[in-house]
């Protein structure tokens, strides 16, 4: 297993060049992609050009950022100047952004090597990456199963070691749930910590960009690089960003951890519950105090989310009309063109959510649904506020199950929505959440542990996650087919 720090040392010690590292990863992608299908667009020429610049820097004796020369993948809903950005939708199949998102610009400036854009559920709407308008990504642990979603391509690419780290976006669990299914670390930061400028919007009050890595340290290094104030994002927080690496400690003495009672109810697989309980015992052994916490409004998270998120999506997706960018269908009138373009360009799940949102925002139902959902959102946030008065970090399973078979839930949207039961309330409250591997089921599929922190307490999440990771070896296991 190759970490950012290991590759950095190889570069600094001149054991390998950045071009050699990039070439190795590009070859690995070529070998594995026919089966995993993590990517929508590969950027080998860009990767080698970026690697060459890093080698030139080394030759000049200049200091390197930890991410310089590190192969990284980007979810294909992040705008990249001159590189297609499709959001896995047919409506944007010919779209090449004229500008760069803030996070990808930061990575370019630091010398990271971009190997490609990863697959996702169309416009980030889904929990399995099966809603992509192009192809379905496979889970590297079992190619017949889904990698989770919507950032399934990024999670699968990291798990298959097609890149070292990757970026995803999380609106209701879209980083944490695929991290759980693919056995990697995934973090959704506090809302506003990372700029959303250049992230194609799904639900603007919930979306947040975050890192995937195979270790907690790799995720911490990547978050450090992308976090920070951006005047181009009105929701960006103007606060200093700490060095997250300093919080990677191994003792949890004095730390109070709360177990969310409501996440251990009906629908939770027994094997997942057992793995999480064993993880709690390990956290206790590391010095943490464990207590049960009740968040009674947690169970309203799913219905609240499926009113608020589609409402925001129906507004955000109104811009795809065949006029400004994306595909355009031939038609006799403007209305006809809108209708044909959107009917052909959007997939079934996106259409479903647009209709849901348009319905809940309509005059007769606005108060009954949208306004009520916003009030319930406040109550969910209050539950978390109350919990954090007595504990530092909250713990739950990341997802009620391990990865399911491709095609198993596509006919039943409600059963698919339940995959994000544990993750959604964290987005509604704007809190940071991290998923890391805490075991495997009987079929060798990874199980994820979710840690939830108070606002801007990513430091505590990294502390707890790193301590647990160092005391276990789940993160060292690799999918057998990728070796």
Swiss-Prot record:
Gene3D superfamilies: Amidase signature (AS) domain. PROSITE patterns: AMIDASES (PS00571). GO terms for cellular component: glutamyl-tRNA(Gln) amidotransferase complex. It catalyses: L-glutamyl-tRNA(Gln) + L-glutamine + ATP + H2O = L-glutaminyl-tRNA(Gln) + L-glutamate + ADP + phosphate + H(+). The keyword Flavoprotein does not apply. Keywords: ATP-binding, Ligase, Nucleotide-binding, Protein biosynthesis. Pfam families: Amidase. Its EC number is 6.3.5.7. The active site is at 75 (charge relay system), 150 (charge relay system), 174 (acyl-ester intermediate). The keyword Transmembrane helix does not apply. GO terms for biological process: translation. InterPro entries: Amidase, Amidase_CS, Amidase_dom, AS_sf, GatA. GO terms for molecular function: ATP binding; glutaminyl-tRNA synthase (glutamine-hydrolyzing) activity. Signal peptide: none annotated. It is an enzyme of class 6 (ligase). Belongs to the amidase family. GatA subfamily. Allows the formation of correctly charged Gln-tRNA(Gln) through the transamidation of misacylated Glu-tRNA(Gln) in organisms which lack glutaminyl-tRNA synthetase. The reaction takes place in the presence of glutamine and ATP through an activated gamma-phospho-Glu-tRNA(Gln). Heterotrimer of A, B and C subunits. PANTHER family: GLUTAMYL-TRNA(GLN) AMIDOTRANSFERASE SUBUNIT A, TRANSAMIDASE. This is Glutamyl-tRNA(Gln) amidotransferase subunit A.
């Amino acid at each position: 297993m190759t970490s950012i720090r290991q590759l950095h040392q190889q570069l600094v010690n001149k054991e390998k060049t950045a071009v050699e590292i990039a070439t190795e990863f590009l070859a690995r992608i070529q070998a594995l992609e026919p089966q995993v299908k993590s990517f929508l667009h590969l950027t080998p020429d860009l990767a080698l050009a970026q690697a060459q610049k890093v080698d030139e820097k080394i030759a000049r004796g200049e200091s390197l950022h930890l991410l310089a020369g590190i192969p990284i993948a980007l979810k294909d809903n992040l705008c990249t100047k001159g590189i297609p950005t499709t959001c896995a939708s047919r409506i944007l199949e010919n779209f090449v952004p004229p500008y760069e998102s803030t996070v990808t610009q930061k990575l370019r400036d630091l010398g990271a090597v971009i190997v490609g854009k990863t697959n996702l559920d169309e416009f980030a709407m889904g929990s399995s990456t099966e809603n992509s308008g192009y192809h379905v990504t496979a889970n590297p642990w079992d190619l017949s199963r889904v990698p989770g979603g919507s950032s399934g391509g990024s999670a699968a690419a990291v798990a298959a070691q097609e890149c070292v780290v990757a970026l995803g976006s999380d609106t209701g669990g879209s980083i944490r749930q695929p991290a759980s299914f693919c056995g990697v670390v995934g973090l959704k930061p506090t809302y506003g910590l990372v700029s959303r400028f250049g992230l194609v919007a799904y639900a603007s009050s919930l979306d947040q960009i975050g890192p995937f890595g195979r270790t907690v340290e790799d995720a911490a290094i990547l978050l450090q690089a992308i976090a920070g104030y951006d005047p181009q994002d009105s929701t960006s927080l103007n606060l200093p960003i700490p060095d997250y690496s300093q919080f990677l400690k191994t003792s949890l003495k004095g730390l109070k951890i709360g177990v969310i009672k409501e996440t251990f109810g009906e629908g939770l697989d027994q094997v997942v519950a057992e793995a999480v309980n064993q993880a709690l015992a390990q956290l206790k052994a590391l010095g943490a105090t464990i207590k049960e916490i009740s968040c009674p409004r947690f169970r309203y998270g799913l219905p609240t989310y499926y009113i608020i998120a589609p409402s925001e999506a129906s507004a955000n997706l109104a811009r795809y009309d065949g006029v400004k960018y994306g595909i355009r269908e031939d038609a006799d009138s403007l209305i006809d063109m809108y209708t044909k373009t959107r009917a052909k360009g959007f997939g079934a799940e996106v259409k479903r959510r647009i209709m849901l949102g348009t319905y809940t925002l309509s005059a007769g139902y606005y108060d009954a649904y949208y306004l009520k959902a916003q009030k319930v959102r406040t109550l969910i946030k209050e539950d978390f506020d109350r919990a954090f008065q007595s504990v530092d970090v909250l713990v739950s399973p990341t997802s009620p199950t391990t990865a399911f078979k491709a095609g198993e839930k596509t006919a039943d949207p409600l059963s698919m929505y339940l995959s994000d039961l544990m993750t959604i309330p964290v987005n509604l409250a704007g809190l940071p959440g991290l998923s890391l591997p805490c075991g495997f089921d009987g079929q060798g599929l990874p199980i994820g542990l979710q840690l939830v922190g108070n606002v801007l307490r990513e430091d505590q999440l990294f502390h707890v996650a790193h301590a647990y990771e160092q005391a276990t070896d789940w993160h060292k296991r690799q999918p057998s087919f990728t070796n």
